[in-house]
Amino acid sequence: MYFVFYRTNDVFAAEELLQNSGIKTEIVPTPVQDKAYCGVCLKISSHELEKSTVLLSNMDYRVVE
């Protein structure tokens, strides 16, 4: 599961928030060819999707499988 953000700063803010909540994340290149998104995103286990979505509810992102 990939959490794709518009700004790189949001990737790092989301990473910190999720890791502080016990969710393992990995910063990886964005798999989306859409130029609207920044070049990196967060890779998160699919079983953490619901918890991650709740924690990031105030951020602007897109989930890509």
Map each language-model feature to its residues:
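Short amphipathic alpha-helix segments
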Residues: 6-22
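Low-complexity, intrinsically disordered short peptide segments enriched in small/polar/basic residues
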Residues: 1, 8, 24-25, 60-61
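Short glycine-/aliphatic-rich beta-strand segments at the starts of folded cytosolic domains
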Residues: 1-4, 40
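A short glycine-rich beta-strand->turn/loop micro-motif centered on a GG-aromatic cluster
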Residues: 5, 24-33
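C-terminal structural segments of small proteins and small subunits
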Residues: 30-33, 37-65
